[in-house]
Amino acid sequence: QVHTIVRMMRMITEIVCPGVLLLGEVVMEPEKVVPYFGTLEKPECHMLYNVTTMASTWHTIATADTRLLKHQMDIVTRLPKDYVFLNYLRCHDDIGWGLDYEWLKQFGIAEAPHKKYLNDYFRGYVEGSDARGELYNDDPVLQDARLCGTTASLCGLEAAGFEQNEEKTAQAIQRIEMLNAYLFIQSGIPVIYSGDEIGQVNDYSYKES
């Protein structure tokens, strides 16, 4: 039914307000995201947030393992050029770890403990990590949670500034530059916003209210 509704929305907007673009957000692995573009004959969304690549990129930072990201990019590059992704590193929203866990199983990676590792890494709870993120929608029963944080804070710039450590600051900046370079070579439209355009670190003022 979702696809029928989106298809109807696309048809209506093309008649009533043809200047409007439909931007969809689907937190799933690439194979399950693609159908929301529809087909060339029956199009649905004009663009989709590239949520999965965003999450897979941060997975790559935390694991220093590029296999998942390469696997996903191989899928994306084979898609029709009419399918446009909106690519970003971070945004106003959290990171939901909707990775391709079926594919990751072959490497002995299980979903629940891996999500915990990623959340621990990006909160600076893993040795060698200077990331500073915060949990969102933490469910201790399901052992599932989402993660919030700006690119600068997740890359270690916040911690380096707090410690006044010049070496860590330089490393964090290199990490940010690398991720943005990768963002700009992806197929689609790159977007830098929600504080990332000025290297903003996390704002904790919400805790004071």
Predicted features and spans:
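Active-site and adjacent substrate-binding regions of carbohydrate-active enzymes
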Residues: 1-209
